[in-house]
């Protein structure tokens, strides 16, 4: 995985004063949230979907039913853009068109890979569950068979913050 910002496919941030370059801070944002939005490419059209996820320090994982539009799109084109943001709000102004968004955001690019290895699939599901609960679960084979686990191998990350 590349270091943040410097090799982002969309280039550097225009506002360098808002860029997050500290990888520890970027990872903290990723770990602190539970929901991310993933953008997929469906032919010539974008497709955006929110998913619950987990982060193992190098990759993101989410789960899904084995069928559906998201799965079909990933099978055709596994390029993914993802967005995770925290500390949302707005900064008021006395001037029209001068209100601003308060946030800390990570946007990344990656490749979506279907996890086929049973041990990795269970590890990923354990990470996702641990993100929401302290309970430990067993996964009946029927549940594992009907659940797709997708790993996003991160290619680039870019962090930005404002008003926080």
Q: For the regions a protein language model found, what residue spans apply to each?
A:
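Charged, gly/pro-rich active-site loop segments
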Residues: 1-17, 87-164
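Short, basic/aromatic recognition patches
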Residues: 9-37
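Anion-coordinating catalytic cores for phosphoryl-, nucleotidyl-, and glycosidic chemistry
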Residues: 18, 27, 69-72, 82
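Short, intrinsically disordered, mixed-charge
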Residues: 31, 75-80, 127-134
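Short beta-strand segments
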Residues: 33-66
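Short conserved beta-strand and strand-loop elements enriched in small hydrophobics
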Residues: 38, 80-84
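Well-ordered beta-strand positions
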Residues: 52-54, 75, 153
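Compact nucleic-acid interaction/catalytic patches
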Residues: 60-80
């Amino acid at each position: 995985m590349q270091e943040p910002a410097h090799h982002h496919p969309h280039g550097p941030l225009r506002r360098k004063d808002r860029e997050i370059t500290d990888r520890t801070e970027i990872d903290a944002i990723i770990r602190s949230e539970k929901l991310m939005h993933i953008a997929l490419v469906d032919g010539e059209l974008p497709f955006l979907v929110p998913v619950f996820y987990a982060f193992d320090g190098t990759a993101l994982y989410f789960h899904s039913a084995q069928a559906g539009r998201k799965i079909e799109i990933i099978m055709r084109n596994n390029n993914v853009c993802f967005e995770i943001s925290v500390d949302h709000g707005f900064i008021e102004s006395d001037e029209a068109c001068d209100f601003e968004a308060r946030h800390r955001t990570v946007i990344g690019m990656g490749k979506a890979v279907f996890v086929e290895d049973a041990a990795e699939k269970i590890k990923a599901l354990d990470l996702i569950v641990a993100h929401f609960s302290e309970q430990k679960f067993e996964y009946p084979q029927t549940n594992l068979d009907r659940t797709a686990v997708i790993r996003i191998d991160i290619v680039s990350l870019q962090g930005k913050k404002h008003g926080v």
